[in-house]
C-alpha cells in the first residue's frame, strides 16, 4: 500500500443562467444543471442568473454580470463556471479570457457524464464522436482553459482516457470512429432483424432521466440494471424478457432519459435509444 495517496481536487463551480422572460423555466433549468454538475463530480459553490431579453452574443451574460462573476469567483474560491446553455466558440473564448478560469457549458457536462456511463462499444463510439465534434470548433478556448487547470471535467473520454486536443489528430480519430460505428451498427441491425422475425412484441420504457425507468424494468423482469439516484444512470439500452400471465412474452428495453436543452447535434449520442424506440412504432 502506498504511503501517500494523491487525490484529484474536487472542482468547485459557479452556475450561470439567463432568464429571457418572466415565468420561464430558467430557475428549474439551472437546478437541473446543478444535478448534472454533481453527477459529473463537481461541487456547486454559487449561482448567477441574469434577466435579459437575449443571450449576449459575446459573453453569454452582460458585461456587468461578467464583473459580478469575477467577484463571485474570488469570494467562493471557484475553480470554474458552467453556463446553462451551449456556448459558441466566441463566447467560450471571451469568458475564458475575461474570467481567467475554467469555462464550461451544459453540453460539456452532459458529454462528460455520457463518457462515464457508456459501457457498450456503440455507446462509447457515439459519445467519443460527440465529444470530439464539440471540441473541434472550440479548441482555442478549451485548450487554454483545460490545459491550465490540468483536466478534470471535460477532458475525460469513455473509459477515463484523456481526450485528444490536436485538430489534425481529432479529425483522424473522428474518421476512424465513423468507420467503427458503421460496423457496429451493421451488427445491431442483424440482431434487430432476428428479434423482429421472432415475433415477440417489443416495448420501450421511455421517460425523463432519473424518473425510475431502470427501477421499473428491474421490478418487472428481475433484471439487474444499474439503479442510481443520478441523472443518466443508464446510457446504453438494456433489453430483458417479461413473461405475462398468459405465457406470452414481450421484450422490454430501458432507454436513455430525456433532459432539457439537449442540442440537436448531441442527439447522435442518443442514437441507440432512438433506434430502440423506432422499432416499437
Identify the meaning behind each predicted range:
Residues 108-130:
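Short alpha-helix plus adjacent loop in nuclease-associated cores
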Residues 23-26, 59-63, 85-86, 118, ...:
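Conserved phosphate/pyrophosphate-binding and hydrolysis machinery centered on Walker-type P-loop NTPases
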Residues 1-112:
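N-terminal accessory targeting/assembly segments
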Residues 71-82, 133-145:
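Extended, charge-rich low-complexity interaction segments
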Residues 33, 132, 170:
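A residue-level signal for conserved active-site and pocket-lining positions in enzyme catalytic cores
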Residues 125, 132-135, 139, 177, ...:
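Non-transmembrane amphipathic alpha-helical segments
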Residues 4-13, 142-268, 274-278:
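Conserved G1/Walker A P-loop phosphate-binding module
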Amino acid at each position: 500500500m502506498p504511503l501517500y495517496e494523491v487525490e484529484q481536487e474536487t472542482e468547485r463551480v459557479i452556475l450561470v443562467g439567463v432568464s429571457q422572460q418572466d415565468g420561464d423555466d430558467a430557475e428549474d433549468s439551472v437546478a437541473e444543471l446543478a444535478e448534472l454538475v454533481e453527477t459529473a463530480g463537481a461541487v456547486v459553490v454559487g449561482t448567477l442568473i441574469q434577466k435579459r431579453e437575449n443571450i449576449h452574443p459575446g459573453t453569454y451574460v452582460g458585461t456587468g454580470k461578467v464583473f459580478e462573476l469575477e467577484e463571485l469567483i474570488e469570494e467562493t474560491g471557484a475553480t470554474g463556471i458552467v453556463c446553462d446553455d451551449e456556448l459558441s466558440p466566441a463566447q467560450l473564448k471571451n469568458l475564458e479570457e475575461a474570467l481567467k478560469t475554467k469555462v464550461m457549458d451544459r453540453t460539456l457536462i452532459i458529454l462528460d457524464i455520457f463518457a462515464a456511463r457508456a459501457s457498450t462499444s456503440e455507446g462509447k463510439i457515439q459519445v467519443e464522436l460527440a465529444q470530439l465534434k464539440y471540441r473541434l470548433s472550440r479548441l482555442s478556448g478549451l485548450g487554454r482553459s483545460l490545459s491550465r487547470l490540468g483536466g478534470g471535467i471535460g477532458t475525460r473520454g469513455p473509459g477515463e482516457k484523456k481526450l485528444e486536443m490536436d485538430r489534425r489528430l481529432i479529425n483522424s480519430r473522428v474518421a476512424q470512429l465513423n468507420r467503427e460505428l458503421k460496423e457496429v451498427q451493421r451488427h445491431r441491425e442483424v440482431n434487430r432483424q432476428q428479434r423482429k422475425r421472432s415475433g415477440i412484441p417489443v416495448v420501450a420504457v421511455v421517460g425523463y432521466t432519473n424518473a425510475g425507468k431502470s427501477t421499473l424494468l428491474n421490478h418487472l423482469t428481475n433484471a439487474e440494471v444499474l439503479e442510481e439516484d443520478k441523472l443518466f444512470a443508464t446510457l446504453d439500452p438494456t433489453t430483458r424478457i417479461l413473461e405475462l400471465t398468459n405465457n406470452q412474452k414481450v421484450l422490454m428495453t430501458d432507454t436513455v432519459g430525456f433532459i432539457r436543452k439537449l442540442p440537436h447535434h448531441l442527439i447522435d449520442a442518443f442514437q441507440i435509444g432512438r433506434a430502440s424506440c423506432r422499432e416499437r412504432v
